[in-house]
Amino acid sequence: MIFKVWFSYEDEEVELSELTNDTTVSAIRKILHEGKIFRFPYGTSQTDLQIGKMLPSGSGGGATADSKFEKFKARNTLADIQYKVGDTLYVRVKKSKPTNDSLLPTLNIAFLDGSERAIKWEYDPYTTTAQWTCTATLVKVEPVPFAEGAFRKAYHTLDLSKSGASGRYVSKIGKKPTPRPSYFEDVKMQMIAKKWADKYNSFKPPKKIEFLQSCVLEFVDRTSSDLICGAEPYVEGQYRKYNNNSGFVSNDERNTPQSFSHFTYEHSNHQLLIIDIQGVGDHYTDPQIHTYDGVGFGIGNLGQKGFEKFLDTHKCNAICQYLNLQSINPKSEKSDCGTVPRPDLIFPDTSERDNNNNNNNNNNNNNNNNNNNSNNNNNNNSSISKSLVEISSGSKERNDRDSPSRQLFVSNDGNTLNTNKERSKSKSIDLEKPEILINNKKKESINLETIKLIETIKGYHVTSHLCICDNLLFTGCSDNSIRVYDYKSQNMECVQTLKGHEGPVESICYNDQYLFSGSSDHSIKVWDLKKLRCIFTLEGHDKPVHTVLLNDKYLFSGSSDKTIKVWDLKTLECKYTLESHARAVKTLCISGQYLFSGSNDKTIKVWDLKTFRCNYTLKGHTKWVTTICILGTNLYSGSYDKTIRVWNLKSLECSATLRGHDRWVEHMVICDKLLFTASDDNTIKIWDLETLRCNTTLEGHNATVQCLAVWEDKKCVISCSHDQSIRVWGWN
C-alpha cells in the first residue's frame, strides 16, 4: 500500500508521497536530509535527525508546548510504529553536547578576514548504505586561481576548521555554469575510486595508491556566481596525467595507474572500469568510471564503448602480471609497458567522447595544415606545404594553371569523372611527381644518412600540433595556449604565448593575414597574424574541433559532431555544413576542387567544392583514419589500424598498403618524395615514395609522436610528443 505522510519541523509542514508500510525511519531521514525538505541548521547531518511523535501531557488531544517527543528507532518501519494515514510525524534535530568553554582555543579575529561560510558535503562509500553527510565550516578561498584546465579553475583554499597543513585545500570551480549534481557526481566517483584503491592496495602491489578525500563545498553567503565547487586536499608536487587523452607524461610511474585500471575491470567481473587517472605521484584525483550498462557517473560514462577503447589500447605490464590479472591485448616484447589511451577519451562527448577532457588533448589531423596557404608568398618556399599542392590564397588563375590535383577527377575526354560509373580496376602506382614547386629554384634532396637529433625542447604541457609560418613555429598545447617559437642560430626560442581558448588547441592553419586555431572548447579563434592577438571567435560546432584547413575562399573545420563546416573568409559566417560521416571528422586535405575528409568511421570521403556534396567514399581501413595528405595523383592515409594506405585518385582504388609501425599512425607529412610518419610506437619512419619502403626510423621520443612539420629552409623536421617534448631533427 502506497500512501502520503505529513511531517512537521518547527513551524513548517510538508507531505511526502509514495511511502509504504515497509519504509524505515532511516530511509525517511535520508529523504528529508538529501532533499533539503526543511531548513535545518547548518552542519546538520543525516544522523542528527530524529523522527517521532508527540505524546500529549494532559488529557486534551494534539501536540502542545508541554507535549513529550517520543523518538522512533532508525530501523523501525511505518508498520512497526503503527502509522495511520492522516497522522503527522514530527522531526527534531539532535542537540549537540555542551562544551567546556575553557577548553576552546582563543579565536584570532584577524585570521577570519576574507573567510566565508560553507557547507561541506562528504560521501562515504564504505557504509552499506553509502550516504552523504554535511557539516558547517569556515573557508578562505584565494580570489585568483593558481592553475586551470580545459573546464575548471583551481584556487588555493583554507579550511579554517582544521589546523596546519591539513587545512590546505584546492577548490575546483567550473569555467562555465555547471549543474549542481555534476559536482556531487564527481566527488562520488572519486570516493568510489578511493574504495577500489584500498582493495587494490590489499593485494600488495609494488606501489600503493590513494585517491584524495574529496568533498563538495556550497558557499552560504554568495548570491551571484560560483555558489558551489569541488574541493580536495592540496598536495605539493608536479601534477601529471597518466591515463587520458594527452597520453603519458612520464614513463616513470605509468605502470601503476594502468594496472589499477586493469584491476578494477577484472575484479568487478567486467562491470566497472576506472580510467582517467591523474594526480601528484601516487595521490590520484578526478577519475572517470565506466559501467557495463552505461548508467550513472555523468556524461563521461561511455559504457561498453569505454570498455572497448580500454581493451583496444591497454598493454599489460609487470604489475598486471604480478597481480595475476588476465592478459589483455598481448603485444610483442618490443612494446613498452603501459597504456596509451585513445586521444579522444578526455573530451566530454556523450556519443563518442571524441574530446575532452580535454582535457583533456588527439590532434591527428595536423598534416592538413602543413598543406595550407602555399600561394601566399610566391618567392618563399619555407614551408613543406608550399612545395606540395596549390590549395591556398593565391589567384584562381594560378591555381587552375599550376595545381595538378585539378586533373584528379578529369577523364580522358576532359569531362568531370562520374564516380558512379564503372571505374578502372588498375592497381598500378603513379609516383611521378608533377612540377608544382612555388618557384623554379631547384630543391636540394634530403640525405637520410645525415639526419640526427639536434635539439630538444622540454615543457610542462603536451604539444599536440605544429604549424610553420615563415620563420615562426606555432604549437598547439594541452594547456589551452598557442606557443610561438622563433628559430634563431639553430636554437628554438619561445617568443610569445597566445591565450584565449578554454580547451586544448588541436589544429592551426594560416593565410597571409590571419591565424586560425581549432580547440576542444568547440570554437575556432581568428588571430591577427601581425599583432598576434585574437580578433574573432567562430562558434557553431557542438563538440571539439579537431582540424582546420584553408583555401582561397573558405575555412573548413572538422569536429566530433560528425560535421565539416565551411566558413566564408570574407564574412566569417558559416555558409555550409557538410554531413555524411558517421563519427568524428579528424583530418582534412584539399586538392583542387576536391576536399578529402578522414574520420573515426574508418572512411575517407571526397567532396566536390562546387556542389559541396560527397561524391565518393574510400573504404579500406579497419580503424579510425587519423591523417591524410596528397602528392600528385596519390592520396596517403594513416590509421589506427597501424597501416598507411596509398590511393590512386584516377581509379579511386587502394594501390598499396605500407606496414611497419607497431602502433597507431598519428600524422604524416611529405617532402622530397619522402613520407614522414609519426606513430604511437614512439617512432618516426621515413618512407621512399618510389620504392614504398621504409628507409629510416628515428627514435628518441618516450611516448606517442603526435605531429610532424618539415622546415625545408632550416633543413629539419620537427616532432612533438606526449612525452612533453618538441624535437628538432636536422640533415646536411
UniProtKB/Swiss-Prot annotation:
InterPro entries: a-kinase_dom, Alpha-type_PK, G-protein_beta_WD-40_rep, Kinase-like_dom_sf, WD40/YVTN_repeat-like_dom_sf, WD40_repeat_CS, WD40_repeat_dom_sf, WD40_rpt. Residues 395-404 have a biased composition (Basic and acidic residues). GO terms for biological process: mitotic cytokinesis; myosin II filament disassembly; response to differentiation-inducing factor 1. Residues 124-328 form the Alpha-type protein kinase domain. ATP binds at G298, I299, G300, N301, L302, G303. Residues 356-394 have a biased composition (Low complexity). It is an enzyme of class 2 (transferase). Its EC number is 2.7.11.7. Residues 331-428 are annotated as: Disordered. One of its GO terms (cellular component) is cytoplasm. It catalyses: L-threonyl-[myosin heavy-chain] + ATP = O-phospho-L-threonyl-[myosin heavy-chain] + ADP + H(+). Keywords: ATP-binding, Kinase, Nucleotide-binding, Repeat, Serine/threonine-protein kinase, Transferase, WD repeat. GO terms for molecular function: ATP binding; identical protein binding; myosin heavy chain kinase activity; myosin II binding; protein serine/threonine kinase activity. WD repeats lie at residues 458-486, 500-528, 540-568, 580-608, 620-648, 660-688, 700-730. CDD domains: Alpha_kinase_MHCK_like, WD40. Residues 405-419 have a biased composition (Polar residues). Belongs to the protein kinase superfamily. Alpha-type protein kinase family. ALPK subfamily. Catalyzes its autophosphorylation, which is needed for enzymatic activity and phosphorylates myosin II heavy chain at a threonine in the C-terminal tail region. This phosphorylation is critical in regulating the assembly and disassembly of myosin II filament. Participates in control of myosin localization. This is Myosin heavy chain kinase B. It comes from Dictyostelium discoideum (Social amoeba). The gene is mhkB.
